[in-house]
Amino acid sequence: LDSNIPEKLRKEIKERTKGNAHYTEVYRVAKWGIIEEKVFLSTYGELLADILPNDPEKYPMDEIGTYSTSVYTGREPCDKYISCLKRSKRLKKTYPYPVVIKGKTSKGCVELTVNRDKEADPEHIDWWIYDGKRSNVMQDFIIAPQNQE
């Protein structure tokens, strides 16, 4: 697991995810419009890189979800997130061309978040990517074709 995860939480992640199968089809938003390593940063990684604002209430340092990379079993949550990015003038300026990417989880541990948090989006998956493996997992993703509506 990522070396920046506290040891107590690393143990919890390993226990919770033991035996969990990887997902063969997941979706994520590439906020910058391309598939690159930073797209696969965990929430904590985005906090360290000043991509996300440090908000201890929203991103508690003692919860395992803060250290995961979020992916979804369906595309819809990603489309909704992109709509939010485009509605905000500030975020639209920061992320002018966000896209939905599609791929599979690997090289880490996974948990369907609702198994831990009954209030979570039922399509949300926490994915803890192994240290140094972001460049490997990004090869398993493509830009998802536009929805035909």
Model features per residue range: what roles?
Residues 32-42, 107-113, 136:
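Short, surface-exposed beta-strand/loop "edge" segments at domain boundaries and coil↔beta transitions
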Residues 5, 52-132:
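ADP-ribosyltransferase catalytic core
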Residues 17, 86-89, 146:
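Generic secondary-structure transition motif, activating predominantly at the C-termini of alpha-helices
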Residues 1-63:
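ADP-ribose/NAD+-binding catalytic cleft of ART/PARP-like enzymes
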Residues 121-149:
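Active-site or metal-binding loop neighborhoods of secreted/extracellular toxin and effector enzymes
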